[in-house]
Amino acid sequence: IYTYDLSGKTLNYFPMGRINNIDLRNDYLIQNRTVSLLAGTNRDFNRIDFLLIGSNGNVDEYLDNSFQTELTSVYGLCMFKDTDNSKTFIFVTDEESLAIYQYEITSYAPISAK
C-alpha cells in the first residue's frame, strides 16, 4: 500500500502483499489515540490486513494488523460501523465460491474477529 499527499508525492509504502479492496471507518480508540481504521483484503495470504490513520492524516503500521480468514481466495471488502451499539463488521467476498462472509471485530489490540 502506498500513501500520497495531495500533490502526488509518496509519503509511505507498506509492503504487505497484494492488497485488493480497501475501506476505512473513523473514530476508534486504539493504542490510546483516536484513529481511523483501514482494512484491506490481502490476496497473498487470504487475510484482512489493517492500518491506522491518525488525526493528522499519517498512516501507521499496526503491529497486531491482520485477521486470518477461512476463505480460499479473498477479494472484495467493505466495512460497516454500527454507531448504535459500537460494533464494526467487515464483509468479504471469496472470488472462487462467490460467497460473502461477515466478520464482527471483537477486539482491536490485537485485532480479532468472529
Identify what each model region corresponds to.
Residues 1, 90-92, 106-111:
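Extracellular cadherin-type adhesion modules in metazoan precursor proteins
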Residues 2, 49, 99-101:
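WD40 beta-propeller blade core
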Residues 5-46, 61-65:
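Blade-loop segments of beta-propeller domains
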Residues 22, 77, 113-114:
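Generic structural motif
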Residues 27-30, 50-60, 83, 103-114:
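Short loop/turn segments immediately following beta-strands, especially the blade-tip
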Residues 35-36, 101-103:
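Short, conserved, GDST-rich strand-edge loop motifs in beta-rich repeat architectures
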Residues 41-43, 93-96, 105:
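Short loop/turn segments immediately following the C-termini of beta-strands
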Residues 46-88, 92-93:
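Asp-box/WD-like beta-propeller blade repeats and closely related beta-sheet repeat scaffolds
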